[in-house]
Amino acid sequence: MENPPYHVSISKSEEIKYRQKCKDLKARIQEIQKGNQELLSKYEVIRRAVKRGRLERAILMEQLELQSEAKSREFGQRSEPSPPPPPEGIKIKISTKGAGNPSAKKLKISTEETSDTNVALNNTSEISHKSSNNSQPKDASVNDTDADFEQQNQVVQSKDEKITNTDPIPSPIITNLKTESSKSSGAKKATSNAKITDTMLFNHFSSIQKPKLKAEGSTLKGQALKKTLEDTWNNLTEEEKKPYHEGLLAAREKAREARRRRSAQNSAKLEKEKAKEKQKDKDQEQDTVSDKNQIDEIEKGQKEVDEEPVSEPTTSPILPPKNQEPIRMGGFTVVNRSSNA
């Protein structure tokens, strides 16, 4: 037959001490778990912030590059300061022909004010002539002054006629007078064409010709290769240089379009990341709520366990059953079956 289990008697103070130690260990475990959860949440927030910062930096760098190109084009087209305003009595009309090119703007002087000045000068000359005929000259100096005055009137009239009969005076470049047509696509193409220099065209030509020379088996390098390319470029005519000019424009437009597309992709990616982060925050909030509910349930069960009454240990000696002999060993009582049984 199997031996019965050992019966161990524990004092009340030891049992209370063990219970208190168990409570302390559970409280410590819960405190450590709570601290770990807080550290994990902080780490997740910092990781998302770093990722968002990197994306925003990439987008800002793209926008800065586009703005710098626009500013460089604007400053490249900025011309000399505008001339002083015309004198009073002269109206300036700006023709709308060739508004895309600032150098094609012309000033037209209206003849309204000049005709009025001619009429006034003619009237004054007639009055002075009549007065000179009616009145007898007293001195020779008076006649001389009248003659000088008439000559001045004739000179002024001849100048006015020349101004009205001549072609419109070409105006200098005026930066402040910009029409709506200058903001069209044609004006943008003109600005891009004006910005391209001979050095840029030569570099584009070199980038195209170098692979061709290498494929043909040329061994030129360094200054010799550069000299050959320069001689070839200088021997080309304007018509032969036109394809390289158009190719450079197409390449720059392609690069600009690629930058715009990259910027749009980065912005879309940032929006997706923000949406994912919002969804993750919601999920994390739900997890924290569920964890809190579980912790509350555990604490509630712990309180119920703590509130249960502790049974006091019996102080009466443990009597062995029949046919069993008690054996005392230290603080324990071991019951063995007798040999008679």
Curated annotation (Swiss-Prot):
This is HMG box-containing protein C10F6.08c. Residues 195-263 bind DNA. One of its GO terms (molecular function) is DNA end binding. It comes from Schizosaccharomyces pombe (strain 972 / ATCC 24843) (Fission yeast). The modification Phosphoserine is found at S316. Residues 68-195, 236-341 are annotated as: Disordered. It is found in: Nucleus. Residues 116-157, 165-177 have a biased composition (Polar residues). SMART domains: HMG. GO terms for biological process: chromatin remodeling; DNA repair; transcription initiation-coupled chromatin remodeling. Keywords: DNA-binding, Nucleus, Phosphoprotein. Residues 178-195 have a biased composition (Low complexity). Residues 68-77, 238-256, 269-304 have a biased composition (Basic and acidic residues).
